[in-house]
């Protein structure tokens, strides 16, 4: 049985939090916060210096091989773009979905241009006009060049803005017929799928418009892995207590390729939540879960993966047994491990914000 999203506010007592850390007598959470801001300022200053070095170069000597350009590009464009573009299973599914789902002559908005791949696929599928938006200026310019090299600039327009900043009339000439929004991470929502679709559905898509994907589901299993736990938690090292590092541990879900780490599943796979992208509110919320343990053990997290409904019977998913997918699985940690016995039902609460999954007892 599938569970449709119940959108309601998340009570504070159900928010997942890392284990409390004892501050030393000469320490202060305010000093940690100030140090965090200082770290951000230093990173921004370093980027500004590299950008200034690029801008000071004569245009004729500016090269893509320049060290300053390479440094900025490394920080600015995540490496997963390459794995994604080389994911044949993903590409084939999306191309087929666009070919079957886009009516001839339709106006299409693609959220998140990247290299321009999906915008070009939409044009090839028969769209009359394609708009694609990209908030990263470097990627937007790459997409423009790739699209131009394929002779599609007369059909495709790249807009250097996030979708939430688009003006439906000024930028798009009116609401579009089809919305393409494959902006998902290992846990579905980490790239802002929910707020982006929520906004686009209300402001950028015609009332009877087509959404690709039209629905998204999360599946999951109870899981235990001391090795994965160590990726985001520490107590001692070399005989010293370094647990204060846990203040910078990831809160909520993070990516793990489960088949590369020793782990034990402690339940069968189960549907966790479904988002009807065309009709559901898509607001932050939570829902109860009841998962039955299949073995004795200590539950440390929920392992989660998504399933996108692309229409025409086409789905896109990243389960643990699919090594072909470039997407990893999501690891949603519990605050504390919970011992279970085989046959015991564990009651949990799954919560989601616009960007993060959390689970609590």
Curated annotation (Swiss-Prot):
Transmembrane intervals: none
Q: Where is this region: Disordered?
A: 1-24
EC number(s) per UniProt?
A: 2.1.1.381
Give the record's GO biological process terms: antibiotic biosynthetic process; methylation
Record's protein name? Arginine N(omega)-methyltransferase
> SAM-dependent MTase PRMT-type domain: which residues?
65-361
Q: Return the similarity comment.
A: Belongs to the class I-like SAM-binding methyltransferase superfamily. Protein arginine N-methyltransferase family.
| UniProt entry keywords in alphabetical sequence | Antibiotic biosynthesis, Methyltransferase, S-adenosyl-L-methionine, Transferase
Query: What would be an example GO MF term here?
Result: histone methyltransferase activity
Organism equals Streptomyces achromogenes subsp. streptozoticus
For this protein, the record's PANTHER family field holds: PROTEIN ARGININE N-METHYLTRANSFERASE, PROTEIN ARGININE N-METHYLTRANSFERASE 7
Query: What is the catalytic activity of this protein?
Result: L-arginine + S-adenosyl-L-methionine = N(omega)-methyl-L-arginine + S-adenosyl-L-homocysteine + H(+)
Q: Which InterPro entries match?
A: Arg_MeTrfase (IPR025799), PRMT_dom (IPR055135), SAM-dependent_MTases_sf (IPR029063)
Its function, per the record, reads: Involved in the biosynthesis of the glucosamine-nitrosourea antibiotic streptozotocin (SZN). Catalyzes the conversion of L-arginine to N(omega)-methyl-L-arginine (L-NMA), using S-adenosyl-L-methionine (SAM) as a methyl donor.
* Database matches in CDD domains: AdoMet_MTases
Specify whether Plastid is a keyword of the entry: no
Q: What happens when the gene is disrupted?
A: Deletion of the gene abolishes SZN production.
Where does this protein act, in terms of pathway?
A: Antibiotic biosynthesis
Ranges annotated as biased composition (Basic and acidic residues): 1-17
Disulphide-bridged cysteine pairs? none
């Amino acid at each position: 049985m599938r569970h449709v999203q119940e959108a309601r506010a998340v009570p504070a007592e159900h928010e997942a939090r890392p284990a409390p850390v004892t501050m030393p007598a000469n320490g202060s959470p305010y000093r940690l916060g100030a140090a965090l801001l200082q770290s951000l300022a230093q990173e921004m200053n370093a980027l500004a210096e590299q950008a200034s070095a690029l801008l000071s170069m004569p245009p004729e000597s500016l090269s893509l091989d320049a060290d300053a350009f390479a440094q900025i590009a490394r920080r600015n464009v995540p490496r997963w773009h390459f794995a994604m573009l080389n994911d044949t299973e993903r590409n084939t599914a999306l191309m087929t979905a666009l070919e079957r789902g886009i009516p001839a002559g339709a106006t299409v908005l693609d959220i998140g241009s990247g290299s321009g791949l999906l915008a070009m696929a939409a044009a090839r599928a028969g769209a009359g006009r394609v708009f694609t938006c990209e908030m990263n200026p470097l990627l937007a310019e790459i997409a423009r060049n790739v699209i131009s090299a394929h002779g599609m600039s007369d059909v495709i327009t790249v807009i250097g803005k996030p979708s939430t900043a688009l003006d439906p009339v000024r930028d798009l000439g009116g609401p579009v017929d089809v919305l393409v929004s494959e902006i998902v991470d290992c846990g579905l929502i980490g790239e802002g799928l929910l707020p982006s679709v929520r906004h686009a559905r209300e402001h950028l898509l015609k009332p009877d418009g087509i959404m690709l994907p039209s629905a998204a589901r999360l599946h999951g299993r109870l899981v235990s892995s001391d090795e994965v736990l160590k990726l985001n938690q520490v107590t001692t090292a070399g005989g010293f207590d370094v647990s204060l590092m846990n203040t910078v541990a990831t809160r909520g879900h993070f990516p793990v390729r489960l088949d590369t780490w020793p782990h034990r599943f402690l339940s069968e796979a189960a549907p966790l939540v479904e988002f009807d992208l065309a009709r559901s509110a898509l607001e932050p919320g939570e829902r109860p879960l009841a998962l039955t343990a299949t073995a004795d053990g200590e539950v440390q997290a929920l392992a989660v993966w998504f399933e996108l409904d692309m229409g025409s019977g086409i789905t896109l998913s990243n389960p643990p047994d699919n090594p072909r997918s470039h997407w990893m699985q999501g690891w949603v940690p519990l605050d504390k491990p919970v011992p279970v016995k085989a046959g015991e039902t564990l009651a949990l609460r799954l919560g989601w914000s616009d960007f993060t999954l959390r689970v609590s007892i």
